[in-house]
C-alpha cells in the first residue's frame, strides 16, 4: 500500500504548526523536499514521502510518551518540534540512484554525507542555521542525540553521556519514540 499523500501532508502541516513553525518555514521545508524524501536508504519507509511519515510517527510517539511520563519540556511545542525535525537532514541524505532505479514508485537511494556531520548534529545545524528556528538546549540535544548511543565511541560517547546526564528523560524519550516508530510502527515497510 502506498503512503496517502494528501492526508499525510495535512497531518504533517498540522503537526509542523503545532511545533510553532510559520507558513514560510513550512514552505521552505516543502522546497527542500521534506514531503518527498525517504526516511532511510533501504530500511524503514525507503520511499518518497517516507521521511514525513516517519516524522509523524515519531512525533505521535513522543507526544504520547511526554503525556504518559509527564515530561517537562521548555515549551508545549517542544515534542512536536523535536519529532517533526529530528531527521530533517535526510532531505539531503538520500539521492535517487538513477543507475539502479527501474520503478519510479520504489526508487533505490544512495547516501550523501552531510558537511554538518552525523544526521543528529546535521539536523540541529539545518534547523538553527538554515531554517533559523531557535532551539532550546533540551530541544537541540534531543535532536542531536535521538539515535542514543548507537555507533558512538570515544569522545562522542562521552559527549552523549554528558547530554544524557543533563536531560535524561527527554533524551531517552526522544530516542525511544524514534526506535518505536522505525522498528515497531514501520517494521518491514518500505512504504505504507
Question: What does each model-identified segment do?
Answer:
Residues 41-45, 53, 60, 65-190:
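Divalent metal-dependent catalytic cores for phosphoryl transfer on phosphate-bearing substrates
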Amino acid at each position: 500500500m502506498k503512503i496517502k499523500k494528501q492526508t499525510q501532508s495535512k497531518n504533517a502541516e498540522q503537526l509542523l504548526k503545532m511545533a510553532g513553525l510559520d507558513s514560510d518555514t513550512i514552505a521552505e521545508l516543502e522546497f527542500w523536499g521534506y514531503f518527498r524524501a525517504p526516511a532511510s536508504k533501504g530500511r524503514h519507509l525507503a520511499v518518497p514521502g517516507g521521511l514525513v511519515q516517519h516524522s509523524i510517527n515519531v512525533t505521535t510517539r513522543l507526544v504520547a510518551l511526554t503525556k504518559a511520563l509527564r515530561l517537562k519540556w521548555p515549551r508545549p511545542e517542544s515534542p512536536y518540534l523535536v519529532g517533526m525535525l529530528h531527521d530533517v537532514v535526510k532531505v539531503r541524505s538520500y539521492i535517487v540512484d538513477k543507475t539502479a532505479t527501474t520503478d519510479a514508485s520504489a526508487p533505490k537511494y544512495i547516501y550523501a554525507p552531510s558537511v554538518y556531520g552525523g544526521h543528529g548534529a546535521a539536523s540541529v545545524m539545518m534547523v538553527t542555521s538554515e531554517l533559523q528556528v531557535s532551539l532550546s538546549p533540551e530541544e537541540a540535544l534531543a535532536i542531536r542525540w535521538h539515535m542514543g548511543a548507537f555507533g558512538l565511541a570515544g569522545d562522542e560517547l562521552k559527549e552523549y553521556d554528558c547530554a544524557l546526564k543533563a536531560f535524561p528523560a527527554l533524551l531517552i524519550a526522544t530516542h525511544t519514540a524514534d526506535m518505536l516508530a522505525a522498528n515497531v510502527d514501520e517494521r518491514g515497510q518500505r512504504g505504507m
